[in-house]
């Protein structure tokens, strides 16, 4: 080009994008969101996370979820898309499918559900008609909104019939489940929940379902990681369909997964997800699911799952040793419900006090709870996140002691606060979390 020649003009498309579009960081492009993210990172680093539905994902999972896969539309399924250019997202989805099948011993897997609620909606869409009767664990006894709560679509469009737990021990009475099923002849029976700490008798549930001609579904969203790690019974051989979120104890990105061994049902679930409920799948999330499934297939994940359960038992026993009531007397999985009534405490007040002390949990209703849902008589505690960062039995015994210290202090106060105790515990929490850093 001669010295007098002018450089070629930018194309209209190039000219419309600022030079920083492909290079600016979040801090440059949106300082307010960058500050919120930095604040959340600090919170996760310096607080002990005991919310049972939360976990800490690997950097690899986050990298996949923040990848260029987010740019791609891919309506349909691998090899049968409504868009071109899907050859690489097909690779990611096929890997996710095959790894999920291997992880849980299932013949078929749908990795496209955007959430746990949507995966359960898809099963309902595939197996039920509006007005059909189905059974699930009562939300007040540890079930989930999508299992027939009156405020949820499942309770509005269908006819839910609930089973509960025994008042005397907080455990599901399988004979009562059988009686309810026989009396109501549901088309679908669901096992699983969000706050039930004991093992599920999948074999008996299937026998009951078969006796009334019902489909049997297991929602293992909370304990899927324990199933993958071999420390919890696998529902896949017993159920017509199994659903799970991919986060929680499975330690992946937020999303859903549907598993079955029945090819005819698999086709129904695929159609229910697309085009029934969703359009284009979130390919960046599916890529992250594939990464998480690969992580869960490694031997060290079995060690992790074992530690989650051991830590939960240690935390429950420590709290019992400090005079706290644990619903059902203990735990077989990753979570527990603490009944605060003997301490004359409410769940909402206790949650806030623990958060001020650097321990994150959630208020939770207990079986036969007289309090309103935003007050509650209990708190729910879980061990997956703190176990991920390296806490063991000794650390959870310390955590149990700190929880007891805070709650006993606010029980003796007039306003539900104990500033000196909360501050002292928060300092010890920071010492503990500093020993087990994340995302360095």
From Swiss-Prot:
Binding-site residues, (6S)-5,6,7,8-tetrahydrofolate: 139, 143-145
Pfam families: SHMT (PF00464)
Cited HAMAP family: SHMT
Origin organism lineage: Bacteria, Pseudomonadati, Pseudomonadota, Alphaproteobacteria, Hyphomicrobiales
Single GO term (MF): glycine hydroxymethyltransferase activity
Functional summary from the UniProt entry: Catalyzes the reversible interconversion of serine and glycine with tetrahydrofolate (THF) serving as the one-carbon carrier. This reaction serves as the major source of one-carbon groups required for the biosynthesis of purines, thymidylate, methionine, and other important biomolecules. Also exhibits THF-independent aldolase activity toward beta-hydroxyamino acids, producing glycine and aldehydes, via a retro-aldol mechanism.
Xref: SUPFAM superfamilies: PLP-dependent transferases (SSF53383)
EC class: transferase
Family in the record: Belongs to the SHMT family.
CDD domains, sorted: SHMT
Name of the gene: glyA
UniProt record, GO biological process: glycine biosynthetic process from serine; tetrahydrofolate interconversion
Cofactor(s) listed: pyridoxal 5'-phosphate
Name of the protein in its database record: Serine hydroxymethyltransferase
Species of provenance: Rhodopseudomonas palustris (strain BisB18)
Stored PANTHER family: SERINE HYDROXYMETHYLTRANSFERASE (PTHR11680), SERINE HYDROXYMETHYLTRANSFERASE 1 (PTHR11680:SF35)
GO CC field: cytosol
């Amino acid at each position: 080009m001669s010295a007098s020649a002018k450089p070629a003009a930018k194309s209209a498309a190039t000219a419309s994008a600022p030079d920083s579009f492909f290079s600016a960081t979040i801090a440059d492009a949106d300082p307010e969101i960058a500050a919120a993210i930095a604040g959340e990172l600090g919170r996760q680093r310096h607080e002990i996370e005991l919310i049972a539905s939360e976990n800490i994902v690997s950097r690899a999972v986050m990298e996949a979820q923040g990848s260029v896969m987010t740019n791609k539309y891919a309506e349909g399924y691998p090899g049968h898309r409504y868009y071109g250019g899907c050859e690489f997202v097909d690779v990611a989805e096929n890997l996710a499918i095959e790894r999920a099948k291997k992880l849980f011993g299932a013949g078929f897997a749908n990795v496209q559900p955007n959430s746990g609620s949507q995966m359960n909606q898809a099963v309902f869409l595939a197996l039920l008609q509006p007005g059909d009767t189905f059974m699930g664990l009562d939300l007040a006894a540890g079930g989930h909104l999508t299992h027939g709560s009156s405020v949820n679509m499942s309770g509005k469009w269908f006819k839910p019939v609930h089973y509960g737990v025994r008042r005397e021990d907080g455990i599901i009475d399988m004979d009562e489940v059988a009686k309810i099923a026989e009396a109501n002849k549901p088309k679908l029976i669901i096992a699983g929940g969000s706050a039930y700490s004991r093992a599920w008798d999948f074999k008996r549930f299937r026998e009951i379902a078969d006796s009334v001609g019902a489909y049997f579904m297991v929602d293992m969203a909370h304990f899927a990681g324990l199933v993958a790690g071999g420390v919890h019974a696998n529902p896949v051989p017993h159920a017509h369909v199994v659903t799970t979120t991919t986060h929680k104890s499975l330690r992946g990105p937020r999303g859903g997964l549907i598993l079955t061994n029945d090819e005819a049902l698999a086709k129904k679930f695929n159609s229910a997800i697309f085009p029934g409920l969703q359009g284009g799948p979130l390919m960046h999330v599916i890529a992250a699911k594939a990464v998480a499934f690969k992580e869960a297939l490694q031997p060290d994940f079995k060690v992790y799952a074992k530690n989650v359960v051991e830590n939960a038992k240690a935390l429950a026993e420590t709290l019992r040793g400090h005079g706290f009531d644990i619903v059902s007397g203990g735990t077989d999985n990753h979570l527990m419900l603490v009944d605060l009534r003997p301490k004359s405490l409410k769940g909402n007040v206790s949650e806030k006090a623990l958060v001020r002390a650097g321990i994150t949990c959630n208020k939770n209703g207990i079986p036969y709870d007289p309090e309103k849902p935003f007050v509650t008589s209990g708190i729910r505690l879980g061990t997956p996140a703190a176990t991920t960062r390296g806490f063991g039995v000794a650390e959870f015994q310390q955590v149990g002691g700190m929880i007891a210290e805070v709650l006993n202090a606010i029980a003796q106060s007039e306003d539900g606060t104990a500033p000196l105790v909360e501050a002292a515990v928060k300092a010890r929490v920071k010492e503990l979390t500093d020993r087990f850093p994340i995302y360095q």
